[in-house]
């Protein structure tokens, strides 16, 4: 095991000098004793002359030149398998929940090759989420990739928590949650929510929060993904939740300049597309098992053309776009039905009835969008009878797209609802065909199925 010495420390980037005949490989883990704590470094570049440039996986405070560094001669390895379920771990797979050792039987390196072309499988099976707007407008594929796009505070994390709860309870599958650079409070809320719903023993939690150094946030997504790959290779259908993929990109940006790379557009790292590709290509389904991934994507300044969200778009099967305008109307989940897309919304996959209903809902909402200017200037009375009907139905549809969440019961005071796809299609079809024209639009707000809206109307 070779030993080197620290020659330079700039923030999270540490240069280490090794003997010429024992230079560590790129992505090897190194270990240094920093006071009472062991700090892990990951080799990023070989600079020549025996010097390697590394990223620290923890705080580099207290490091000084001349400290001894050991080459562990393998990449960072984390525990995998059932022992990780119900536990909270950090980027190195060490437990941070005060419950003792993980007790794993196996450890895997976090850097792995993506499955080869012939191992991949293509599935057309739908994954029912119980959330009306998602199941109708942008259905998820089992083994597909979904992005939750939204600016600050429109509900990405709440939507993700609801998805985990619904899928864990209704489909009883294993999930891995990677918290990448998000708020520690959310991580804490999330753990307690999972415990209260009795699904914690089906979820592995890996956290690298906002206060962690960039090296930690850059690698924590890979730690979570490695745990998910193990479940997949055992022949299971596993869910991988990443909150937030933007912080993964941002961590790369933070260390990129320190590693001596020229910045590219908007100051992002020049290797943005490659870094994203390396992660996304591993999140895939094979003939043994599937990984269905849901990734929250923070959209800086609500600009979807920013390089980070734009690079993520290319890898997804379905996009759920959360809109600030819809959130400001008090409609939650604030999913934009006109902006959200899914490859699965195809009559050959979802069936003709589902497809026609979704497209019908979109055309009514689109027409309402066009009429809004006329209504704002001239008022409702100037519209034709046909347009008045479209507006009335559109407003009912808009309200019916809202739904009380289980994970938000504390805030809303109304019990959460899980709506089956069959009931969702029946409800929206009924509104479009005019079956519920006689009901007031308030009856459709924050209810589950259409039958609940009818019941609510009787009380109004």
Curated annotation (Swiss-Prot):
Pfam families xrefs: ATP-synt_ab, ATP-synt_ab_N, ATP-synt_VA_C
Keyword Cell membrane included in the entry's annotation: yes
Species name: Salmonella paratyphi A (strain AKU_12601)
Role noted for this protein: Produces ATP from ADP in the presence of a proton gradient across the membrane. The catalytic sites are hosted primarily by the beta subunits.
Family: Belongs to the ATPase alpha/beta chains family.
Catalytic reaction equation(s): ATP + H2O + 4 H(+)(in) = ADP + phosphate + 5 H(+)(out)
Subunit structure: F-type ATPases have 2 components, CF(1) - the catalytic core - and CF(0) - the membrane proton channel. CF(1) has five subunits: alpha(3), beta(3), gamma(1), delta(1), epsilon(1). CF(0) has three main subunits: a(1), b(2) and c(9-12). The alpha and beta chains form an alternating ring which encloses part of the gamma chain. CF(1) is attached to CF(0) by a central stalk formed by the gamma and epsilon chains, while a peripheral stalk is formed by the delta and b chains.
Domain of life: Bacteria
Gene Ontology cellular-component annotations: plasma membrane; proton-transporting ATP synthase complex
EC number of the protein: 7.1.2.2
SMART domains reported for this sequence: AAA
Name listed for the protein in its UniProt record: ATP synthase subunit beta
Subcellular location(s) of the protein: Cell inner membrane
InterPro entries assigned to the protein according to its UniProt record, in alphabetical order: AAA+_ATPase, ATP-synt_VA_C, ATP_synth_F1_bsu, ATPase_a/bsu_AS, ATPase_alpha/beta_chains, ATPase_F1/V1/A1_a/bsu_N, ATPase_F1/V1/A1_a/bsu_N_sf, ATPase_F1/V1/A1_a/bsu_nucl-bd
Residues given in the record as ATP binding sites: 150-157
């Amino acid at each position: 095991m070779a030993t080197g010495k620290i020659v330079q420390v700039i923030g999270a980037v540490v240069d280490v000098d090794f003997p010429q005949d024992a230079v560590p490989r790129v992505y090897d883990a190194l270990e240094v004793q920093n006071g009472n704590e062991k700090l892990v470094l990951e080799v990023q570049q070989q600079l020549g002359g025996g010097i390697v440039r590394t990223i620290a996986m923890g705080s580099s405070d207290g490091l000084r030149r001349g400290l001894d560094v050991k080459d562990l001669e393998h990449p960072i390895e984390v525990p995998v398998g059932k022992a990780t379920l119900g536990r909270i771990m950090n980027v190195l797979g060490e437990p941070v929940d005060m419950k003792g050792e993980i007790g794993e039987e196996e450890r895997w390196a976090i850097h792995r090759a993506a499955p080869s072309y012939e191992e991949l499988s293509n599935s057309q099976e739908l994954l029912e989420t119980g959330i009306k707007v998602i199941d109708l407008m942008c259905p998820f594929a089992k083994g597909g990739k979904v992005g939750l796009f939204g600016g600050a505070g429109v509900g990405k994390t709440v939507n993700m928590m609801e998805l985990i709860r619904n899928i864990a309870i209704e489909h009883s599958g294993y999930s891995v949650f990677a918290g990448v650079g998000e708020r520690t409070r959310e991580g804490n809320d999330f753990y307690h929510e999972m415990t209260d719903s009795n699904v914690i023993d089906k979820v592995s939690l890996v956290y690298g929060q906002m206060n962690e150094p960039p090296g930690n946030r850059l690698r924590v997504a890979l730690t979570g993904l490695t745990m998910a790959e193990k479940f997949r290779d055992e022949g299971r259908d596993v869910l991988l939740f990443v909150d937030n993929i933007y912080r993964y990109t941002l961590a790369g940006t933070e260390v990129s300049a320190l590693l001596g790379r020229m910045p590219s557009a908007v100051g992002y790292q020049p290797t943005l597309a490659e870094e994203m590709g390396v992660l996304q290509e591993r999140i895939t389904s094979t003939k043994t098992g599937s990984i269905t991934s849901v990734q929250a994507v923070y959209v800086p300044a609500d600009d979807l053309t920013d390089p980070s969200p734009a690079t993520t778009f290319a890898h997804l099967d379905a996009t759920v776009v959360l809109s600030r305008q819809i959130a400001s109307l008090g409609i939650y989940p604030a999913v934009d039905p006109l902006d959200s897309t899914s490859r699965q919304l195809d009559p050959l996959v979802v069936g003709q009835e589902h497809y026609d209903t979704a497209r019908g809902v979109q055309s009514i909402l689109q027409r309402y969008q066009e009429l809004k200017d006329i209504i704002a200037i001239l008022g409702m009375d100037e519209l034709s009878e046909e347009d008045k009907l479209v507006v009335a139905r559109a407003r009912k549809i808009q309200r019916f797209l809202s739904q009380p969440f289980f994970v938000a019961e504390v805030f809303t005071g109304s019990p959460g609802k899980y709506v089956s796809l069959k009931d969702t299609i029946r409800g929206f079809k009924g509104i479009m065909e005019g079956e519920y024209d006689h009901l007031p639009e308030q009856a459709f707000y924050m209810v589950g199925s259409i039958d609940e809206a009818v019941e609510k109307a009787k009380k109004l």
